């Protein structure tokens, strides 16, 4: 019903509440423009390795342009989900997964990063499952991404989600990960 609008309304129906194995409650929800500070703080607190694995460069924080692009999204053509928990009545971002629809309109490219201290607790798995479900529901047929060959935790996660992992033809320091939705 909103296809005629330039900016689609916030997809409140995509908000999901879940619990980690350690009993901590988290919310997975689409990012909002007002999450800019949350996203910037999250990125700043990532280790240099996590930043490098996510951005494939050694950034310290998001530029204003990146922050705008990452938080003011067009929910029709892309999606960004954040995992948050409450800490003393403030939201804390634990991870973010996003996709952007490719020009072919049938596939999308994804990115994922989870805060260092929250890795190996199922957050990346939950974010990716939710993201893949949204992409599938929107008629996308394929999700793909690039992962550095030495990012073993991410490659393990991709395999556990049944992504095909293959060497990147032009660069052996990168693996291509693909799944048919």
Q: Residue locations for each model-derived region?
A:
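Long, contiguous binding/interaction regions
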Residues: 1-181
């Amino acid at each position: 019903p909103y296809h005629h609008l330039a900016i689609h309304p916030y997809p409140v129906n995509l908000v999901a509440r879940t619990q980690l194995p350690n009993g901590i409650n988290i919310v997975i929800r689409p990012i909002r423009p007002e999450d800019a500070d949350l996203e910037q703080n999250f990125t700043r607190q990532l280790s240099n390795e996590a930043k490098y694995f996510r951005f494939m460069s050694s950034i310290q924080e998001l530029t204003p342009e990146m922050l705008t692009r990452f938080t003011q999204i067009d929910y029709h053509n892309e999606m960004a989900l954040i995992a948050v928990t409450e800490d003393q009545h403030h939201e804390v971002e634990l991870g973010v997964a996003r996709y952007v629809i490719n020009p072919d309109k049938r596939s999308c490219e994804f990115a994922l990063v989870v805060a260092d201290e929250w890795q190996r607790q199922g957050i990346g798995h939950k974010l990716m499952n939710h993201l893949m479900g949204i992409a599938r529901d929107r008629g996308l047929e394929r999700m793909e991404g690039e992962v550095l060959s030495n990012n073993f935790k991410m490659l393990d996660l991709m395999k556990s989600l049944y992504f095909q992992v293959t060497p990147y033809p032009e660069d052996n320091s990168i693996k291509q990960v693909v799944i048919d939705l």
